[in-house]
């Protein structure tokens, strides 16, 4: 997937038709068969006939403004635009005639007469569609001369830190406006003025930074000239080659082309064929990659014996040997279980797999954990119990077939913006939205979208709200009885029906506790049960909670009761927070589970790993991270290997975490920056950014995508190599020569990954969704199609238990946290990019009445 020369991706001009009916026509003497609804422009492109175009793009609806794609059709008058003309059976189309040549040259003359001819010094020289089309139509001179004064008096808008807007280069094709509207769904751009005075305007003729623009880059991607251009391209020039890889921010898992000049990244371009993002991106993935070469990067291994001593730079060999000797010393003194490890949801599947293997096989303990257990293990437990698998059920594409969406405890506009854009498109097409969230998130009321219901649930009462919705569905006869009878356990269902039908679970009875008006809750429940395909998407507002697992079960109950599982447009879908939260769970980063969610106490399962790894494994679950902290404070836990995780900043009760770290005798940090946790470390191993990684990430839709090395590890060693080196120094051999060999081992030991390999992923177009095995050799886009993984679905009783964390006289307010579009997690990466132009510090939002009571004015 390495391109030696950067080429513009093929564009068919208009979107593909989804029709199954085929239409035959003739274009320039060539017989062509395409789906009904296909444009003539696209049909020609499929046949290898490239009709000139400027306003058309296959990720935008046909517009027909540039007048370059005109064709001649037998039996029709005039010269219709091929982008807006659908094919018809028997149609005979001519794309090359003397009259068409004359018209196209005339159109191009008009464009060029009002365009600066500074091509040699233009940043888009060699990557400009206007330049290309001038050559295609054979334009050699301009009869009107060159005035070119239009817009030249307008200043370049360089307010955005990542791209510049030069109105003098604009041909008013409207592609940027349409991309903002159709692809992103922000509606931040418009055409201002008329005729020669027309120009693109951001907001109310504001600078881009002062407008509603979210800097997703869709307009830059759509622009056929240098009107909208990345500043890195302006500074560095055109790229020479590119590498396809996967973004390392949120759980969407966008595919990108890293366009390079030598060993430097020029720009990150969303890959059109990326199955998770379909050529779209957000401000983080598109632009916020500069942290990888930030001056704060730590590129040398370091050690120190005490945390109050200065760091000493050493060789990789000395750092590894020192870390290994400390692990051996501590285990000899305090026992095997005095050490443990933490995997990262930011690292690849292969790296994560090796860390848990290191802990189990080389350390000899099950003391391994991950942040993903805190944020999403309720999903694993809740879904495994009810429907049999620990992951979401659908693809992101599935949302385009939904009719009703429940969005609970999630704010995808900020946390999963590329998915949010696709959701917005479906909502603009007519799907209904129910938001269950304490906050009035952007999707409640955004451009051309208004939620049918916003249920402002009181923090901590999620389970009560969902059980009340189930009460409405059960007592009003809205259950899909046939589906339940065929797919679910009868006894468990009847117990659930009786439970939710009790009067104490009615919306009226729960309103005082949940804060949700009973009428709204009833309306939302009826809409979900009767509105057609119903899908549920949820986030950390559901799972990071004392009743997280119970709430996930309640979500699954609703889906089963209404028959909304096992087909397109429905499902239960957790929106994973980090790029490899799903993968870190899949890879066995839990103290009680081996890769594939199989319990360490299962003798048969453990035996498989023991035979493959050549070592005896502990049958008892190890310590979770909070237990490690407690044990460290009490004196029995003494060493920690922490890869790609800043636990001081990200884990709760910072003072307790710091006390635990101070009590340990050896902390090994593997990271790209000297973070807060590193203040307590004794060994620092330079980590690799995603641009230096080779392996796979697994996103929120179970999609395993390739991550490819864009540049060599700046610290001299890849993360997986460092883990292997430490294991070898401890006496347990890890002798892999490439991450593909690690994936082969994962596939050998994990049933849901049995058919996965790097070559398989490449053959599938860059990604594959697990389960991928003999039963599903090409992966599984939709889960539970014919039956649930566990056989019959199991309804669970979801008793509401009030949270212990309530407002008191001493603590009168409740704090709920949320994502910010421009920043990511604790900000280690994004704070080292120009994203600080939007948010350089955290802000606390407080109700005006609460602020007034406390004398807070701003």
Regions found by a protein language model. Name each.
Residues 376-568, 575-755, 818-858:
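Non-catalytic alpha/beta scaffold blocks inside enzyme catalytic domains
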Residues 2-5, 14-18, 22-33, 37, ...:
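N-terminal export/assembly segments and adjacent metallocofactor-ligating motifs
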Residues 38-42, 86, 348, 624, ...:
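Short, structural beta-strand-to-alpha-helix junction motif
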Residues 32-89:
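N-terminal cofactor/phosphate-binding cores enriched in small/glycine residues
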Residues 584-585, 590, 739-834:
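Long, low-complexity segments enriched in small/aliphatic residues
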Residues 55-56, 194-195, 370-372, 570-575:
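Beta-strand segments within the central parallel beta-sheet cores of soluble alpha/beta enzyme folds
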Residues 27, 339-343, 534-539, 574, ...:
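Short hydrophobic beta-strand segments
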